[in-house]
Regions:
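Extended active-site neighborhood of metal-dependent phosphoesterases/phosphodiesterases
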Residues: 34-35, 39-42, 52, 99-181
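Short, well-ordered secondary-structure micro-motifs
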Residues: 3, 12, 84, 129-131, ...
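Active-site neighborhood of phospho(di)ester-bond hydrolases with catalytic His/Asp-centered motifs
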Residues: 60-62, 86-92, 115-122, 154, ...
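N-terminal active-site segment of His-dependent metallophosphoesterases
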Residues: 22-104
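Glycine/proline-rich, flexible active-site/cofactor-binding loop segments
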Residues: 15-26, 176-178, 183-185
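N-terminal Sec-pathway targeting helices
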Residues: 1-18
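Solvent-exposed loop/turn segments at secondary-structure junctions
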Residues: 64-67, 93-96, 122-126, 157-160, ...
Length: 189
């Protein structure tokens, strides 16, 4: 008889956990605000911010996921107290590709007083994260120019074949006369 009661309790606990997880997923998708193509907005902000300037500066951070608390409490206030024009994350801004992780990093980065761009890294790729990254931020590899510099973001996760990216990169660089080129990649291929 005790075994039956224990199994009933475990069954109802499992049901409660499943209902809780489903409720959380529904909350994430219906209640929290949607965001998409964030890089488009960030690139517009970078262009507007740099317009008419003779020079600019940017900061590069990596693996925000390892210390989100420190990043929020110490790094963001320090960055906001500088004249830095924009921030680049060199990959692994999220701890996994889950929807909740993307929403959390959006909340964290919204505390910055400057535009930001993310490099598509291994953690962004995990748990179907590549689809979320594409929906929330944009393509896994892209480039933009600022003054006499070209900024190039590549996908080293294997999601986008290297041959495709190298062809794209070759075409861009053939027509590019930028004085400086900055390449961001989550990790060496």
């Amino acid at each position: 008889m005790n075994k039956t009661k224990l199994l009933k309790v475990l069954f109802y606990l499992n049901i409660a956990v499943v209902v809780g997880l489903i409720g959380y997923k529904v909350y994430l998708n219906l209640v929290t605000s949607e965001f998409e193509a964030e890089h488009t907005e960030q690139l517009s902000d970078i262009s507007a911010r740099l317009e008419g300037q003779d020079s600019y500066s940017f900061a590069v951070v990596g693996n925000i996921n390892n210390s989100v608390g420190i990043f929020e409490r110490r790094i963001i206030p320090m960055l906001n107290d500088t004249d830095i024009d924009f921030l680049v994350s060199a990959g692994n801004a999220v701890s996994s590709g889950g929807e909740d992780k993307y929403r959390a990093i959006k909340g964290t980065l919204s505390r910055l007083d400057m535009p930001y761009l993310l490099t598509f890294g291994n953690n962004e790729y995990e748990e179907f994260g590549s689809f979320r990254f594409y929906d929330h931020y944009g393509p896994h590899f892209f480039s933009f120019t600022a003054d006499d510099s070209r900024f190039i973001f590549l996908d080293s996760t294997g999601k986008t074949p290297w041959q495709w990216q190298l062809r794209w990169l070759t075409d861009i660089l053939k027509a590019d006369d930028s004085k400086h080129r900055f390449v961001f990649i989550g990790h060496p291929p």
